[in-house]
Amino acid sequence: MAEGNVFACHSTEGWRSKLQEAIDTKRLVAVDFTATWCGPCRVIGPVFVELSKKFPEIFFLKVDVDELRDVAQEWDVEAMPTFIFIKDGKAVDKVVGAKKDDLERKVAALAAAATTTEATLPAQA
């Protein structure tokens, strides 16, 4: 299920499938670890959706920590919201808390870095 360009993962299998898809396509992943009872999560959620529209080259995923506890534990999520940025299956950065400016800056910087890196890679023969 998607809201904007954000895909909500409702199963561990779905999570792993989406993460693998991002790895296979060499895309940066932005994950919103959230909870339905978390007030700040509800405030920052629409910002995450807007960022997904602004940066379609990034894979945006949403994980409810109560629904997918194993995934939250695997990524050491201790507070909500936590935004983790993943490249090639490894965490490269994160933002903890509903910090709109920090989140927007981080996504923009990582998107620019990903674009620059891809542009400077030699072409595959």
Curated annotation (Swiss-Prot):
It is found in: Cytoplasm. CDD domains: TRX_family (cd02947). Residues 2-112 form the Thioredoxin domain. One of its GO terms (cellular component) is cytoplasm. Belongs to the thioredoxin family. Plant H-type subfamily. It comes from the Eukaryota. Participates in various redox reactions through the reversible oxidation of the active center dithiol to a disulfide. The H form is known to activate a number of cytosolic enzymes. Disulfide bonds join C38-C41. It holds the Pfam family Thioredoxin. Keywords: Cytoplasm, Disulfide bond, Electron transport, Redox-active center, Transport. This is Thioredoxin H-type. The active site is at C38 (nucleophile), C41 (nucleophile). The record marks G39, P40 as: Contributes to redox potential value.
